[in-house]
Amino acid sequence: MGRLCFAGIWLLSLAAALVCEKEDKRKTAFVMLAAFAAAAVASVLAGFAVLWADMGSLTAAVQWFSEGRTQHSAVAGSIAFVLTMHCLAGRERTERLAPLFLLLLAALRLSEAFCPPAGLGSELEGVPPAFSPLIREDAYGDPCLAVYRPEAAAALLCALTAAVQGRKGKPTLFPIACRLAAWQIFFENLLTSPLMLGFVRTEQILCLLILLAAAFPGTGMRKKPGAWGWIACIAAMGAVHGLLQFAMDKPYLIAEAAAHTDEGFDAAVAAVPVVCHILAALLSVVMGEIAARAGQRNAEGK
């Protein structure tokens, strides 16, 4: 069911691209098909490589790969899709199709409702499944946080922003990528990901590198000394985000310094993750806006 849903979304996006692109529809169709093919190949290769490296057995990797357990391959597929579009379509065509790509991303996220989702958070004890639209049962019937739903909402919001900015003639691809990357750092806090580097998830580091690359002034567009202020600000907030991640994973260490009684200690342990999640969400929005402004100035050549 999930694979059929993915295939339907790809076909609908291709049809939408042909409708939106008024000139040179043949080249648009070729570029879209090439990007889809590159994404599929990269997704398969990356997923198989990750399984082989984790299991250490070629037979086990083939068995698990045939069952479709290749969640981390989505990252490689997305990168291949974007790079192919950038190389073949050119900047202007990619800018025009940016809202469509964001709608495609939102649709792919929402399609996880019909398959084992990659964007499912940890189990929530004592919470009924119907308590919130952000709650979904996993394969064992336990209520979990459906992180893919706010991720889809973020993509829809970015699609609306890209459509409005595109009509004003402003570059949209870099700013939207910055906002999505910054917000994804927060969404990764809510996921149960086994890929860890210390207490920070590797996906968060990848998103931070995207932000730094967008603000990097070494492309020749921006060589003013003030350009490095963007990078320093983003890197500093990334470090703070890492500390918040540590506080969410190890709340009892913070609670020991805040309370000495049993009741106070329990209350502090419960409060620390909530406060850190709120701070992380606000910090993600600020990081996204700062990086978006830097990326837009780079795109405009200022």
Give the predicted meaning of each segment.
Residues 1-302:
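Hydrophobic, membrane-interfacing alpha helices
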